[in-house]
Amino acid sequence: VATKQDNNRRKRDPETTRAAILEAAKTVLARDGAEGLSVSTVAKVAGVNRGTAYQHFQVKEDLVRATLDSVSHQLLDAVFEGGGPDGEVPEGQLKPDRDHMDEVIERMAAFNMRLAEYAIENSDLCRVWLFDVLSRENPRQDVFYKRFEQAVQTLAESDAGIEDVDVEVQSVMILTGYFMWPVWVRAHARSKKARKEMARRYAMEVLRNAMYGVLQVDTHSILKAYLKSHM
């Protein structure tokens, strides 16, 4: 519950108020879906005056859209290193190539683990993201999906990638799995250690999938060695 001091601070800082409203909206959206979300309900959860909430978001649709966009950017910031606010790849980022496969695989494994752990520890947020993707006319406009697909495409187009990879299919299969896996984790893992182990399992299998779905055969020995040493 917001204190009087919190409310006074928010009156002086509209950005803080907006951030509090969006955080509350994520909670309501994950719990009740878009049908159960209203500006007044979110205002109550956020601990702000309803009139203040309406100053930021006059209609429910504006609040839903702003909340979904903030979730995509939160995912982007959490699992990708650098880049622009619209999903752009950072300038100067090392591109994958077969002469540096050890480093490429290390980076892929680290990314897989970051995303798997984040999805497991923030399953409500991921549920909101899935809702957004399912409700969009063009899911590829989502900044998080856009950046993920670009990463898969960069790997596929490198001299380590196989020809004719369907980048869109690979991206959808992998991301869907990342955000469904927490359902199984919730049913089986009762501790942070157990959740981390299940995150590791998923991350390693995504890496193995890349071996057969994206990478050329002559790179497999390096990836197999990595898997053997980390399984």
Region roles according to the model:
Residues V79, D102, E106, A110, ...:
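Amphipathic alpha-helical packing segments from all-alpha helical-bundle domains
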Residues V1-T16, T27, G83-P96, D218-M231:
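N-terminal intrinsically disordered/low-complexity leader segments
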Residues T41, D69-L76, F80-G84:
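Short, basic, alpha-helical segments at the C-terminal edge of helix-turn-helix-like DNA-binding modules
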